C-alpha cells in the first residue's frame, strides 16, 4: 500500500481523535495539546485538512452530553485552538529553515487562483468542490432509497405473504436486485449509505453517551476528509470509514437492545446478515470482473508489468503494458534523469518513472485552468523542457482510441481534463519556441526544442 497524502490524512486524523477523547475522559489538557498540534500538522498533508479543526465540536458535544460547565468547555477549546496554531506555525518554521516556504506560498497563490477560476477548464474551483460534495451525497441518497424500497418489499412480503412457495421467489428476486445494485453502484456509495444509517442510529437511538460521542467522531471523519477533492469520497475510498464503519457495525450488532418501531428485530438482523453476504460477494465479483481504479477489465488479465524499476510490481493488461513499454523505450535516448519533462495529458506518473522534473512545478498540468496554464507558459523564461503529449484519452477505466487529430482537437470536451482551449495554449508554446518531433508512435509524441 502506498503511504500517500490521503492515508497520512486519515492516520493523523484518527490519532488526533484518539487524544482528544483521552483528554475528555481523563480531563487532562496535555491530550488536547497533542490533538491540536496533530491537527495543525495534518493541515499540510492536504491543504483542505485545515477544516479538521472542526473536531473541536466534539469538545462542545461532550460538554452538552455530560452537562459540563461552560468555563471548562471554553478552556478546553482554547487549549486545543492554541495547540492547533502551534502545529501550523511549527511546520511553517521548518519550511523556512529548509527553504520550502517560498514554493509553498507560491503554491497557495495558485490554489487561490484556481479556486476563483471561472473559465470552465479547471477541476478544483470552489464551485466544483462544493458541487462534488452535493452530487456525491445525492447519489448516496438515491442508492439508500433504492435499498430501503427493496427492504420494504422484503419485510412486507414476510408479513403479508403466508405461503412459502410464493414468499421464496419474492425474496430471491429482492436479493438478486440488491446484488445487481451493489455490483453496478460505486462500492464507496454503499459503504457510505450503511455507515450513515448506523452512525445516525447510534446518535439518535443509543443511550450510551460514549457510543454517541464516538459516532459523532466517525461522522466527522466521513464528512470532513472528502472536502477539497473534485471527486469527493470517491477519490478517498474506504479510508474515511476507519471510525465510521466500526461504529455503524456496533449499531447493527446492538439492534436486539434497541427498539425500532414497526420492524421486528429478527427481520432486521436477518436482512442485515443477508445484505452483508450479498455485498461481499458483489464486491468480490466486481473486483474480479470489472477491474481496478482506472484500469478496467477482468482481474486475471492484469498479469503484465511495465519495464521500469519504479513500477515493475504493478500489473496491468498486455495492451497497456505494451503501450507504456514502447513509450519508455522510445523516449529513453532523448531524456535523462534530472531533465525537465513537460508531460501534457493524463500521464503524471511519467515523471516518476523517468526520474525527470515536472515542468512549471506540476506533473499533471492538464488539471490547471486555461488562464493559469497560459500565464505559466507565457511567463516562463528558463531552459526549454522536452514536451511529451498523448494522442488519446486515458481518463477512465479504458484507454480511448488514439487519433492524430487529438493534438489539435480532443473531440468532445469532458470537463476540465479534455479542453481544446488548453490544447491551443500548448500548441502555441510549441510553435513559438520552434520545437521539433524526435519520437512519435501511435499513442505519443515527444518534442525537443531546436538547438
Question: Where is each model-derived feature located?
Answer:
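Multi-pass, polyprenyl lipid-linked donor-dependent membrane glycosyltransferases
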Residues: 1-15, 45, 51, 186-195, ...
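Perimembrane helix-loop-helix junctions
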Residues: 39, 52-89, 156, 160-161
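Short periplasmic/luminal acceptor-recognition loop of GT-C membrane glycosyltransferases, typified by
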Residues: 285-368, 383-398, 442-447
Amino acid at each position: 500500500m502506498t503511504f500517500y497524502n490521503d492515508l497520512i490524512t486519515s492516520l493523523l486524523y484518527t490519532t488526533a481523535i484518539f487524544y482528544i477523547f483521552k483528554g475528555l475522559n481523563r480531563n487532562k489538557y496535555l491530550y488536547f495539546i497533542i490533538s491540536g498540534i496533530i491537527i495543525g500538522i495534518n493541515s499540510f498533508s492536504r491543504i483542505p485538512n485545515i477544516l479538521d479543526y472542526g473536531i473541536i465540536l466534539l469538545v462542545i458535544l461532550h460538554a452538552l452530553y455530560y452537562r459540563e460547565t461552560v468555563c471548562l468547555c471554553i478552556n478546553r477549546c482554547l487549549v486545543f485552538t492554541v495547540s492547533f496554531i502551534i502545529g501550523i506555525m511549527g511546520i511553517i518554521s521548518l519550511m523556512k529553515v529548509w527553504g520550502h516556504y517560498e514554493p509553498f506560498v507560491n503554491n497557495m497563490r495558485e490554489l487561490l487562483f484556481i479556486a476563483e477560476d471561472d473559465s470552465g477548464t479547471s477541476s478544483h474551483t470552489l464551485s466544483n468542490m462544493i458541487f462534488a460534495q452535493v452530487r456525491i451525497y445525492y447519489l448516496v441518497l438515491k442508492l439508500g432509497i433504492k435499498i430501503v424500497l427493496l427492504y420494504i418489499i422484503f419485510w412486507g412480503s414476510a408479513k403479508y405473504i403466508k405461503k412459502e412457495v410464493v414468499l421464496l421467489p419474492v425474496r430471491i428476486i429482492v436479493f438478486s436486485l440488491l446484488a445487481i445494485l451493489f455490483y453496478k453502484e460505486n462500492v464507496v456509495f454503499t459503504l457510505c449509505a450503511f455507515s450513515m444509517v448506523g452512525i445516525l442510529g447510534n446518535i439518535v437511538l443509543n443511550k450510551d453517551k460514549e457510543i454517541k460521542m464516538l459516532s459523532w467522531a466517525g461522522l466527522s471523519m466521513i464528512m470532513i476528509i472528502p472536502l477539497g477533492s473534485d471527486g469527493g469520497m470517491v477519490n478517498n475510498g474506504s479510508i474515511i470509514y476507519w471510525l465510521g464503519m466500526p461504529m455503524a457495525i456496533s449499531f447493527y450488532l446492538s439492534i436486539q437492545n434497541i427498539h425500532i418501531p414497526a420492524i421486528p428485530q429478527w427481520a432486521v438482523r436477518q436482512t442485515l446478515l443477508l445484505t452483508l453476504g450479498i455485498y461481499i460477494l458483489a464486491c468480490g465479483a466486481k473486483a474480479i470482473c470489472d477491474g481496478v481504479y482506472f484500469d478496467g477489465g477482468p482481474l486475471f488479465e492484469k498479469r503484465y508489468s511495465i519495464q521500469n524499476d519504479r513500477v515493475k510490481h504493478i500489473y496491468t493488461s498486455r495492451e497497456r503494458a505494451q503501450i507504456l513499454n514502447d513509450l519508455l523505450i522510445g523516449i529513453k535516448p532523448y531524456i535523462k534523469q534530472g531533465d525537465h519533462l513537460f508531460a501534457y495529458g493524463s500521464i503524471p506518473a511519467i515523471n516518476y518513472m523517468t526520474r525527470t522534473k515536472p515542468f512549471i512545478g506540476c506533473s499533471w498540468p492538464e488539471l490547471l485552468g486555461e488562464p493559469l496554464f497560459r500565464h505559466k507558459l507565457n511567463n516562463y523564461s528558463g531552459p526549454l523542457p522536452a514536451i511529451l503529449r498523448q494522442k488519446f484519452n486515458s481518463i477512465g477505466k479504458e484507454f480511448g482510441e488514439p487519433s492524430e487529430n487529438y493534438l489539435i482537437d480532443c473531440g468532445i470536451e469532458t470537463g476540465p481534463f479534455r479542453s481544446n482551449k488548453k490544447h491551443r495554449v500548448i500548441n502555441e508554446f510549441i510553435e513559438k519556441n520552434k520545437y521539433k518531433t524526435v519520437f512519435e508512435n501511435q499513442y505519443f509524441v515527444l518534442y525537443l526544442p531546436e538547438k
